[in-house]
Amino acid sequence: MKMQSNVIKIIIVISLLIGVGALYLLLSLRTPEKPLAGQVNIYEDNVKIGGDFELIDQNGEIFNSDELKGNLSLIYFGFTSCPDICPTSLNKMTEIVEILNKHKIDILPVFITIDPKRDTPIVLKEYLKHFHPKFIGLTGNEQQIKGVTDKFKVFYARVNGDDDDPNYMLDHSSFTYLIDANGKYLKHFYLDSSPKEIMEFLKGN
Protein backbone atom coordinates (compact mmCIF):
# COMPACT_ATOMS: atom_id res chain seq x y z
CA MET A 1 0.00 0.00 0.00
CA LYS A 2 2.85 2.32 0.95
CA MET A 3 4.62 1.51 -2.32
CA GLN A 4 1.44 2.31 -4.26
CA SER A 5 1.20 5.65 -2.47
CA ASN A 6 4.80 6.50 -3.39
CA VAL A 7 4.14 5.60 -7.03
CA ILE A 8 1.15 7.94 -7.08
CA LYS A 9 3.26 10.75 -5.59
CA ILE A 10 5.96 10.20 -8.22
CA ILE A 11 3.35 10.29 -11.00
CA ILE A 12 1.93 13.54 -9.62
CA VAL A 13 5.40 15.15 -9.43
CA ILE A 14 6.25 14.05 -12.98
CA SER A 15 2.90 15.39 -14.23
CA LEU A 16 3.57 18.75 -12.56
CA LEU A 17 7.04 18.94 -14.09
CA ILE A 18 5.66 18.13 -17.53
CA GLY A 19 2.97 20.80 -17.07
CA VAL A 20 5.49 23.45 -16.01
CA GLY A 21 7.75 22.53 -18.93
CA ALA A 22 4.89 22.73 -21.38
CA LEU A 23 3.86 26.15 -20.03
CA TYR A 24 7.43 27.46 -20.32
CA LEU A 25 7.65 26.20 -23.90
CA LEU A 26 4.34 27.82 -24.77
CA LEU A 27 5.40 31.17 -23.33
CA SER A 28 8.79 31.07 -25.03
CA LEU A 29 7.22 30.41 -28.41
CA ARG A 30 4.42 32.93 -28.16
CA THR A 31 3.99 35.47 -30.95
CA PRO A 32 5.92 38.69 -30.25
CA GLU A 33 4.00 41.88 -29.72
CA LYS A 34 2.70 43.52 -32.87
CA PRO A 35 4.06 46.92 -33.94
CA LEU A 36 1.96 50.04 -33.61
CA ALA A 37 -1.33 49.71 -35.45
CA GLY A 38 -0.99 50.75 -39.06
CA GLN A 39 2.75 50.28 -39.39
CA VAL A 40 4.37 47.61 -41.53
CA ASN A 41 7.90 46.56 -42.38
CA ILE A 42 9.70 48.38 -45.18
CA TYR A 43 9.40 45.29 -47.35
CA GLU A 44 6.47 43.10 -46.43
CA ASP A 45 6.96 39.50 -47.59
CA ASN A 46 10.02 40.68 -49.56
CA VAL A 47 7.83 42.53 -52.07
CA LYS A 48 9.21 45.84 -53.33
CA ILE A 49 6.79 48.74 -53.01
CA GLY A 50 6.98 51.97 -55.01
CA GLY A 51 9.04 53.14 -57.94
CA ASP A 52 9.34 55.81 -60.60
CA PHE A 53 6.29 57.06 -62.48
CA GLU A 54 5.14 59.81 -64.82
CA LEU A 55 1.59 61.16 -64.76
CA ILE A 56 -0.39 64.38 -65.36
CA ASP A 57 -0.96 66.86 -62.54
CA GLN A 58 -4.06 68.94 -61.77
CA ASN A 59 -2.71 71.74 -63.95
CA GLY A 60 -2.48 69.49 -66.99
CA GLU A 61 1.32 69.35 -66.82
CA ILE A 62 3.50 66.23 -67.03
CA PHE A 63 4.61 65.24 -63.55
CA ASN A 64 7.58 62.97 -62.94
CA SER A 65 8.10 61.26 -59.59
CA ASP A 66 11.61 62.77 -59.50
CA GLU A 67 9.89 66.06 -58.63
CA LEU A 68 9.05 64.62 -55.23
CA LYS A 69 12.69 64.06 -54.36
CA GLY A 70 14.23 66.41 -51.83
CA ASN A 71 11.16 66.24 -49.60
CA LEU A 72 9.24 63.63 -47.70
CA SER A 73 5.93 62.83 -49.36
CA LEU A 74 2.66 61.13 -48.52
CA ILE A 75 0.89 59.34 -51.37
CA TYR A 76 -2.73 58.23 -51.36
CA PHE A 77 -4.64 56.40 -54.11
CA GLY A 78 -8.36 57.07 -54.43
CA PHE A 79 -10.97 58.81 -56.59
CA THR A 80 -12.95 62.03 -56.35
CA SER A 81 -16.36 60.28 -56.41
CA CYS A 82 -15.42 58.29 -53.31
CA PRO A 83 -18.10 59.14 -50.70
CA ASP A 84 -16.23 58.76 -47.43
CA ILE A 85 -12.90 56.92 -47.16
CA CYS A 86 -11.00 59.15 -49.59
CA PRO A 87 -12.03 62.54 -48.16
CA THR A 88 -11.40 61.20 -44.65
CA SER A 89 -7.90 60.11 -45.66
CA LEU A 90 -7.13 63.39 -47.41
CA ASN A 91 -8.32 65.37 -44.39
CA LYS A 92 -6.01 63.29 -42.22
CA MET A 93 -3.14 63.95 -44.63
CA THR A 94 -3.90 67.67 -44.41
CA GLU A 95 -3.68 67.44 -40.62
CA ILE A 96 -0.37 65.56 -40.83
CA VAL A 97 1.13 68.16 -43.19
CA GLU A 98 0.11 70.99 -40.87
CA ILE A 99 1.52 69.24 -37.79
CA LEU A 100 4.82 68.48 -39.52
CA ASN A 101 5.09 72.03 -40.82
CA LYS A 102 4.88 73.26 -37.22
CA HIS A 103 7.89 71.07 -36.49
CA LYS A 104 9.75 72.52 -39.51
CA ILE A 105 9.38 69.28 -41.49
CA ASP A 106 8.39 69.74 -45.14
CA ILE A 107 6.22 67.01 -46.61
CA LEU A 108 4.27 66.90 -49.88
CA PRO A 109 0.77 65.37 -49.95
CA VAL A 110 -0.01 63.54 -53.20
CA PHE A 111 -3.36 62.21 -54.41
CA ILE A 112 -3.25 59.74 -57.31
CA THR A 113 -6.58 58.83 -58.86
CA ILE A 114 -7.58 55.25 -59.64
CA ASP A 115 -10.42 56.61 -61.80
CA PRO A 116 -8.75 58.38 -64.73
CA LYS A 117 -11.92 58.16 -66.83
CA ARG A 118 -13.72 60.69 -64.62
CA ASP A 119 -10.86 62.34 -62.74
CA THR A 120 -9.44 64.72 -65.30
CA PRO A 121 -6.94 67.42 -64.28
CA ILE A 122 -9.79 69.95 -64.03
CA VAL A 123 -11.84 67.65 -61.78
CA LEU A 124 -8.81 66.97 -59.57
CA LYS A 125 -7.99 70.66 -59.28
CA GLU A 126 -11.51 71.51 -58.13
CA TYR A 127 -11.65 68.57 -55.73
CA LEU A 128 -8.32 69.33 -54.05
CA LYS A 129 -9.42 72.88 -53.22
CA HIS A 130 -11.14 71.33 -50.21
CA PHE A 131 -7.85 70.08 -48.75
CA HIS A 132 -4.33 71.35 -48.09
CA PRO A 133 -3.08 73.83 -50.74
CA LYS A 134 0.14 71.81 -51.13
CA PHE A 135 -1.76 68.82 -52.50
CA ILE A 136 -0.54 67.45 -55.81
CA GLY A 137 -3.26 65.67 -57.78
CA LEU A 138 -2.22 63.16 -60.43
CA THR A 139 -4.06 61.38 -63.21
CA GLY A 140 -3.21 59.81 -66.57
CA ASN A 141 -4.50 57.22 -68.97
CA GLU A 142 -5.64 53.82 -67.76
CA GLN A 143 -2.33 52.20 -68.67
CA GLN A 144 -0.34 54.79 -66.69
CA ILE A 145 -2.57 54.41 -63.65
CA LYS A 146 -2.35 50.63 -63.86
CA GLY A 147 1.44 50.93 -63.98
CA VAL A 148 1.77 53.08 -60.85
CA THR A 149 -0.84 51.13 -58.86
CA ASP A 150 1.00 47.91 -59.67
CA LYS A 151 4.21 49.41 -58.30
CA PHE A 152 2.52 50.40 -55.05
CA LYS A 153 0.52 47.16 -54.80
CA VAL A 154 -2.79 49.03 -54.81
CA PHE A 155 -5.99 47.03 -55.20
CA TYR A 156 -8.97 48.60 -56.97
CA ALA A 157 -11.99 47.27 -58.84
CA ARG A 158 -15.32 48.46 -60.17
CA VAL A 159 -18.14 47.21 -57.96
CA ASN A 160 -21.40 48.35 -59.54
CA GLY A 161 -22.99 49.76 -62.67
CA ASP A 162 -22.66 48.70 -66.28
CA ASP A 163 -20.17 50.10 -68.77
CA ASP A 164 -22.46 53.03 -69.61
CA ASP A 165 -23.30 53.96 -66.02
CA PRO A 166 -21.53 57.25 -65.13
CA ASN A 167 -22.20 56.75 -61.42
CA TYR A 168 -20.19 53.58 -60.93
CA MET A 169 -18.24 53.07 -57.71
CA LEU A 170 -14.81 51.58 -57.04
CA ASP A 171 -13.59 49.38 -54.23
CA HIS A 172 -9.95 49.99 -53.32
CA SER A 173 -7.26 49.53 -50.72
CA SER A 174 -6.80 52.53 -48.46
CA PHE A 175 -3.17 53.07 -47.49
CA THR A 176 -1.17 56.25 -47.09
CA TYR A 177 2.40 55.69 -48.31
CA LEU A 178 5.29 57.53 -46.69
CA ILE A 179 8.12 58.19 -49.17
CA ASP A 180 11.56 59.50 -48.20
CA ALA A 181 13.45 62.39 -49.78
CA ASN A 182 15.16 59.99 -52.21
CA GLY A 183 11.86 58.70 -53.53
CA LYS A 184 12.08 55.42 -51.63
CA TYR A 185 9.18 53.78 -49.83
CA LEU A 186 9.45 53.87 -46.03
CA LYS A 187 6.12 52.79 -44.55
CA HIS A 188 2.46 52.66 -45.26
CA PHE A 189 -0.23 53.51 -42.78
CA TYR A 190 -3.84 52.42 -42.53
CA LEU A 191 -6.95 54.56 -42.39
CA ASP A 192 -7.14 54.29 -38.60
CA SER A 193 -3.52 55.35 -38.10
CA SER A 194 -3.13 58.62 -36.24
CA PRO A 195 -0.89 61.57 -37.15
CA LYS A 196 0.90 60.83 -33.87
CA GLU A 197 1.99 57.40 -35.16
CA ILE A 198 3.54 58.94 -38.24
CA MET A 199 5.26 61.59 -36.11
CA GLU A 200 6.67 58.91 -33.81
CA PHE A 201 7.97 56.94 -36.78
CA LEU A 202 9.68 60.00 -38.28
CA LYS A 203 11.27 60.89 -34.94
CA GLY A 204 12.70 57.40 -34.72
CA ASN A 205 14.18 57.57 -38.20
From Swiss-Prot:
> CDD domains of this UniProt entry?
SCO
Q: Which domain of life is it from?
A: Bacteria
The residues that the entry says bind Cu cation are C82, C86, H172
Q: Which UniProt keywords apply?
A: Copper, Metal-binding
UniProt keyword Acyltransferase present: no
Q: Does the keyword Ligase apply?
A: no
Q: Name one GO molecular function term.
A: metal ion binding
Q: Which family does it belong to?
A: Belongs to the SCO1/2 family.
State the name under which the record lists this protein: SCO2-like protein RF_0960
